[in-house]
Amino acid sequence: MTINEYQQEALRTASNLNNKYPRILNGVMGLAGESGEAVDMLKKWIFQGHVLDTEHMAKELGDIAWYLAISADAIGYDLEEIMQMNVDKLRARYPDGFDSERSIHRSENDI
């Protein structure tokens, strides 16, 4: 399955497909909520002695991917475009790979 095929499958199960305003809210809030669940799993693993259930974590990451797909579509992008924009930004920011000096001294408009 390609990333854009995944996005189409995610959209098939999304609600409010004809109203983009609530969909972006649902998407971004869902990203925050699911990311919080993943963070909570890590917190319990690192600080509370829990075992890290990687299968459960993988399912949470899948939920994050679903909300990312919905969010991207709500603003008129497919996931391939989003990913390419991100790679282009990172290549411009770190042409020779990650560099802490370049990270520390990023320009103000480098988002």
Model features per residue range: what roles?
Residues 1-111:
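Flexible "arm" and connector segments at domain edges
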